[in-house]
From Swiss-Prot:
Compartments it resides in: Secreted
Native source species: Salmo salar (Atlantic salmon)
BP-aspect Gene Ontology terms: protein homooligomerization; response to bacterium; response to lipopolysaccharide
The protein's assembly and partners: Homopentamer. Discoid arrangement of 5 covalently bound subunits.
Protein name per Swiss-Prot or TrEMBL: Serum amyloid P-component
Keywords associated with the record: Amyloid, Calcium, Lectin, Metal-binding, Secreted
Cofactor binding description: Binds 2 calcium ions per subunit.
């Protein structure tokens, strides 16, 4: 099931040299903007 995550914030509690986020998306148009 798809979920609208617009307006949501994800917090990584501890910054390390190996902290990372994986994004998997199926898009019908190119992504024109993203903030991380």
């Amino acid at each position: 099931a798809h979920q609208d995550l617009s307006g949501k914030v994800f917090v990584i509690p501890m910054a390390t040299s190996t902290s990372h986020v994986k994004l998997h998306a199926r898009v019908s148009e190119p992504i024109s903007a993203m903030t991380m």
